[in-house]
Structure formats: C-alpha cells, structure tokens
C-alpha cells in the first residue's frame, strides 16, 4: 500500500505520522478495528486494541487541551485537528482517528477502502493523504471476518509489518 501524504493541507498530521513511522512505532502493529464498507483502523502501538498510542512529540496539546508547556507524560501528547483543510473522506484516503473530543488525535489512523466514502466524517477527522497504490488491499482487509472480543476486531490479526517513508520532491510517500 502506497500513500501520498499531503503536508500542505495537514502539516502537523503529516509531521506526526512521519516521525512515528521513522521511529518504527507502526511496525508490527495490528489493524484492531475493521468495518466492511467503511474503514480499517490501526496505529495503536501502545496497546494494540484501540486504547493507546499518542503523538510523536508535543504539538501544544495534552489530552486534547491546548497547553503552553509539554504534558507531564508523553502518553498525553495529542495533536490539534486540521479537519477543515479541504480534504474529504473519499475512498482510498488516510485520516486520523481520535476520540469524540476535538484535538485528541495521536498515533491511530484509518484507511478508507474502495467501497466507502464516509462523508459524515468530513470536518471532524483530519484527512492527511491519499492511497496512490494498493487500495484493493485496504478493501480486502476491510472484508476479513471480525467479531473477536465482541468488537470489530478481526478474528485473526491483520498486521502492518512496516511503514517506510520515501521522500520525494513533491510529497512524503509511505
């Protein structure tokens, strides 16, 4: 799966994602939430179940609240929303997962398969890139059997082996 990141539209989200990827935080992380015709979610490098993960560094927010000084704990680092950047949740895009509260994105992200265009997320979650190759793999993952632990967790783990950053003259690609 190749993703072009849009640093112009979502500079903080792209910076955060790239730093986490370069630190290896996404290596061997599972897609813990998979919903057919909607999305696949991963990036919880802390707990692998959707309850963990945090931003790569202090971006001015701790647990969703703007702060002048860094948080007491790295696990409190969150990033400000950039959801009003003009990018929308079309099929084959990447967006930042967060809680129901603003400015609570950290490390978790979700990929939109070919058969989904969840426009109800526009202006709420930040789209920060587009899948330029391999979206059929995202769609295939979205169709795996789920229900493990009574949730949208795949019955068998689907693991993101590694995320590699390839710098180009135009944009970052993962």
Where are these regions (language model features)?
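Cyclophilin-like peptidyl-prolyl cis-trans isomerases
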Residues: 1-174
């Amino acid at each position: 799966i190749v993703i072009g990141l849009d640093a112009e539209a979502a500079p903080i989200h792209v910076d955060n994602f790239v730093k986490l990827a370069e630190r290896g935080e996404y290596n061997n992380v599972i897609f813990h939430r998979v919903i057919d015709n909607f999305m696949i979610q991963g990036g919880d490098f802390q707990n692998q179940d959707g309850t963990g993960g945090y931003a790569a560094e202090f971006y001015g927010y701790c647990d969703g609240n703007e702060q002048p000084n860094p948080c007491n704990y790295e696990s409190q680092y969150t990033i400000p929303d950039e959801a009003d950047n003009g990018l929308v949740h079309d099929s084959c895009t990447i967006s930042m997962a967060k809680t129901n509260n603003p400015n609570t994105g950290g490390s978790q992200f979700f990929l939109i398969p070919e058969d989904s265009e969840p426009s109800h997320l526009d202006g709420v979650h930040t789209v920060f890139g587009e899948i330029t190759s391999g979206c059929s793999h995202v769609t295939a993952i979205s169709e795996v059997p789920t229900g493990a632990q009574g949730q949208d967790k795949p019955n068998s783990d689907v693991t993101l082996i590694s995320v590699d950053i390839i710098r180009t003259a135009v944009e970052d690609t993962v």
